[in-house]
Amino acid sequence: EIAQCLVGSEMCIRDRTIDYHYGKHLQTYVNNLNNLVPGTEFEGKDLVTIVATAPDGAIFNNAGQVLNHTLYFLQFAPKPAHSEPTGKLAEAIKRDFGSFENFKKEFNAAAVGLFGSGWAWLSADKNGKLHITKEANGSNPVRAGLVPLLGFDVWEHAYYLDYQNRRADHVNELWSIIDWDVVGKRLK
């Protein structure tokens, strides 16, 4: 399913980046996690539970990156139906950020301003309020009890082959392939 989302997304993520990012980086995290979990208290648990409850360490790091990358790649479409969120998500963004443009500005600032490697997330709390967070390394907002809706990977492997040190260009281009229907369904 993830691979289908990437077909034709040449607009801002080139094939060579997909090959490394999806085919090598993500696959390594999956393989590592599959080797680490058997025989532990996390065997048989879903990714969200593992990420939310695992102590810092190898299981958490690999589970976090599998969850993060799965959410990341599934939110893309080569030709999204909408260039902005619709419905309940659009209403929540307007309520919590004033407008979609204000939200994008704040989100871009978080993604570009994150020092080092990590993720920028739009998440919802249990009351439906939206939050923008910056998560270092493989962390995810589920650790704080939030539901991740939209995530931008700002690890260098996500953009360096295409954008070199131009993280802001990478972040700006990702908006063109966001499948707002997928992101909207994550808001409960």
Where are these regions (language model features)?
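Single conserved hydrophobic/aromatic residue that forms the stacking wall/gate
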Residues: E1-G8
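Feature for soluble, non-membrane regions of globular proteins
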Residues: S9-K188
